[in-house]
UniProtKB/Swiss-Prot annotation:
<keyword id="KW-0285">Flavoprotein</keyword>
<feature type="binding site">
    <location>
        <position position="178"/>
    </location>
    <ligand>
        <name>FAD</name>
    </ligand>
</feature>
<dbReference type="Pfam" id="PF21680">
    <property type="entry name" value="GIDA_C_1st"/>
</dbReference>
<dbReference type="InterPro" id="IPR044920">
    <property type="entry name" value="MnmG_C_subdom_sf"/>
</dbReference>
<comment type="similarity">
    <text>Belongs to the MnmG family.</text>
</comment>
<dbReference type="InterPro" id="IPR020595">
    <property type="entry name" value="MnmG-rel_CS"/>
</dbReference>
<feature type="binding site">
    <location>
        <begin position="271"/>
        <end position="285"/>
    </location>
    <ligand>
        <name>NAD(+)</name>
    </ligand>
</feature>
<dbReference type="Pfam" id="PF13932">
    <property type="entry name" value="SAM_GIDA_C"/>
</dbReference>
<keyword id="KW-0520">NAD</keyword>
<comment type="function">
    <text>NAD-binding protein involved in the addition of a carboxymethylaminomethyl (cmnm) group at the wobble position (U34) of certain tRNAs, forming tRNA-cmnm(5)s(2)U34.</text>
</comment>
<dbReference type="GO" id="GO:0002098">
    <property type="term" value="P:tRNA wobble uridine modification"/>
</dbReference>
<feature type="binding site">
    <location>
        <begin position="11"/>
        <end position="16"/>
    </location>
    <ligand>
        <name>FAD</name>
    </ligand>
</feature>
<dbReference type="InterPro" id="IPR026904">
    <property type="entry name" value="MnmG_C"/>
</dbReference>
<dbReference type="InterPro" id="IPR049312">
    <property type="entry name" value="GIDA_C_N"/>
</dbReference>
<dbReference type="InterPro" id="IPR002218">
    <property type="entry name" value="MnmG-rel"/>
</dbReference>
<keyword id="KW-0963">Cytoplasm</keyword>
<dbReference type="InterPro" id="IPR047001">
    <property type="entry name" value="MnmG_C_subdom"/>
</dbReference>
């Protein structure tokens, strides 16, 4: 068997699957190495994809030609758009998925990609020659040769699980950890640390009193994750349920804190701030009498349920006793307890924006090994790493995304510029150009770039062009079509908005909050005829995109002007230009940070914590600006 590849991806989680698929689809001979072929793209924690800002990332992955969105649509058992009460910049898709069907849908995709081979094994060592990675060795003593390697090992590097005082080595429940690989990489001067995450109990649904819980239904409209022309819902759509903890449960949890790995010194690593354990919640918020819990199905046919909001590493007996104090769980039976896991990660400031190591050429890092948390954040990094690994093998310009192009761009820029001291989770608040990074236009932003790269194929590109043309036609019609006050005022009163004193353009009416493209078209026959010309199955998607462009035109334009101004600083390259130690006009902290991160541009330098505006002015002067 030939063990020589262009690209090898270590780990078949969400980052690894996207990385391997991208590299192979671009034409690189690719190998994806995983400990267990039956666990590819395993959803280790919540059986859900998307959420606030995360849903936008999944749509961006899809727009780039990735697969997470397609697999999610294919295996979703509940779909919702979050933040509907806010503006479209904040709307985020989220889906519950069938955990096992998600795995097998991904495996079917991977096994049918030309150029992609899957190998089941554990990697123990990378081979580096003259500062460049050239291969790896596995525990089966197989040597692989590669031009590029992408590390996407998730929580498996020296993983250690905790339930109370019990500690068990492993990368996930009932799965072994990966040893020696961290040390092999660290030998070459790459710094690493430890982080922690956790997961809640899994509950036998036959023991739950659903009548004592509130139901949470999904939505059945046209929204989905993928921009491809696929059917909206494939599987039976299921409910979720909500309830609350109570003071009795909190007292049980407090009494168990002495045996909590988080509070007795057993766990020293930092956990995710925005997904705290239940014991952290009751300690951090002692006055809060209840915390909301979400009970979520693990699949279409299983009785297994995931208890969102009750992540814990307390002893199993404490977890069960506390939950039984909640009326809906008074007869609780669990499949397994919640647990915490500690694992190795690598400081992401040691990476370029392509996710290639600055210290070892052709070695890329993506996913949780970079200090992030979440399937979506992992997948976004994975597709960028896979693309750039292919480019390193076959030539071409590095492929990066700017902060005004994608949430993936914000994510990677934050990682490589600011670093992490806790697991990084994406939020809309991390993006300064939220109005430009909406869920509805990820295809408009990214698909053409991926098409030029060769990752997006003709069918997806044709869908983009037809959608773009239809949206432009609608916007142009409303911009040019004149409305007479006498002919529309009765309709405006029916729609609950102020009558006109004089004529206006149709676009001015649609800008009103009470007016939508669909409701005003019922009173403007010419506009209705224009909309009826759209025979595309995605008509609702097209109308939504056009309406957002119309209603938010001013905000979008203003944000674009700001982004373009700051983009000028991105054009001022400074990497390798300065000996920062010798620049006494910079603050001491700035010299240290600039030397460590070695930013590519003035704009990146300006985002480094500890580098002040006056330090940036010094660099601008020295750059001749």
């Amino acid at each position: 068997m030939d063990f020589k590849y262009d690209v090898i991806v270590i780990g078949a989680g969400h980052a690894g699957c996207e990385a391997a698929a991208a590299a192979a689809n671009l034409g690189s001979k690719t190998c994806l190495i995983t400990m267990d072929m039956n666990k590819v793209a395993q959803m280790s924690c919540n059986p859900a994809v998307g959420g606030i800002a995360k849903g936008q990332i999944v749509r961006e992955i899809d727009a780039l030609g990735g697969y997470m969105g397609l697999v999610t649509d294919q295996t979703a058992i509940q779909f919702r758009i979050l933040n509907r009460s806010k503006g479209p910049a904040m709307w985020s898709p989220r889906a519950q998925c069938d955990r096992n069907k998600f795995i097998w849908a991904w495996r079917e995709i991977l096994e049918n990609i030309p150029n992609l081979h899957i190998w089941q094994d554990t990697v123990k060592e990378i081979i580096v020659e003259n500062g460049e990675v050239v291969g790896l060795k596995t525990f089966w003593d197989v040597t692989f040769h590669a031009r590029c390697i992408v590390l996407t090992a998730g929580t498996f590097l020296n993983g250690l699980m905790h339930v109370g005082k019990t500690q068990l080595p492993g990368g996930r429940m009932a799965e072994p950890a990966s040893y020696k690989l961290t040390e092999s990489i660290a030998e070459h001067g790459i710094e690493y640390g430890r982080m922690k995450t956790g997961t809640p109990v899994r509950i036998d649904g036959r023991s739950v009193h659903y009548e004592l819980m509130d139901t949470q239904d999904g939505e059945c409209d046209f929204h989905k994750f993928s921009f491809m022309n696929t059917s909206v819902r494939h599987l039976k759509q299921l409910q979720c349920w909500t309830c609350f903890t109570n003071e009795e449960a909190h007292n049980v949890l407090r009494n168990g804190l002495a045996d909590s790995p988080l509070f007795n010194g057993q766990i020293q690593s930092i956990g995710p701030r925005y997904c705290p354990s239940i014991e952290t919640k009751i300690v951090t918020f002692p006055d809060k009498e209840q915390h909301q819990l979400f009970l979520e199905p693990e699949g279409e046919t299983t009785q297994e349920l995931y208890l969102n909001g009750f992540s814990s590493s307390l002893p199993m007996e404490i977890q069960i006793e506390a939950l039984k104090k909640i009326p809906a769980f008074k007869d609780l039976v669990i499949y397994r307890p919640g647990y915490a896991i500690e694992y190795d990660y690598f400081d992401p400031t040691q990476l370029k924006h392509t996710l290639e190591s600055k210290k070892i050429k052709n070695l890329f890092f993506a996913g949780q090994v970079n200090g992030t948390t979440g399937y979506e954040e992992a997948g976004g990094q994975g597709i960028i790493a896979g693309i750039n690994a292919h480019i390193n093998c076959h030539g071409g310009e590095p492929f990066t995304l700017a902060r005004d192009e994608a949430y993936i761009g914000v994510l990677i820029d934050d990682l490589v510029t600011k670093g992490v001291d806790e697991p990084y989770r994406m939020f809309t608040s991390r993006a300064e150009y939220r109005i430009l990074l909406r869920m509805d236009d990820a295809d408009m932003r990214l698909t053409e770039r991926a098409y030029k790269l060769g990752l997006v194929k003709e069918d997806r590109y044709a869908l983009l062009k037809s959608k773009r043309e239809a949206v432009e036609n609608i916007v142009n019609f409303t911009r040019n079509y004149s409305i007479k006050a006498a002919l529309i005022n009765d309709a405006l009163e029916n729609l609950g908005t102020t009558p006109l004193r004089q004529g206006c353009k149709l676009i001015d009416l649609i800008n009103r909050p009470q007016i939508t493209i669909e409701n005003i078209s019922e009173y403007v026959p010419a506009f209705k005829r224009e909309l009826d010309k759209i025979t595309d199955e995605r008509k609702e998607e097209i109308l939504e995109a056009a309406e957002i462009l119309i209603k938010y035109e001013g905000y979008i334009g203003r944000e674009r002007i700001i982004a373009d101004k700051l983009a000028r600083l991105e054009s001022i390259k400074i990497k390798g230009k300065f000996d920062y130690d010798s620049l006494q006009s910079l603050s001491t902290e700035a010299r240290q940070k600039l030397k460590k991160i070695d930013p590519e541009t003035i704009a990146q330098a300006s985002r480094i914590p500890g580098v002040s505006p006056s330090d940036i002015n010094v660099l601008l002067v020295l750059s001749g600006r």
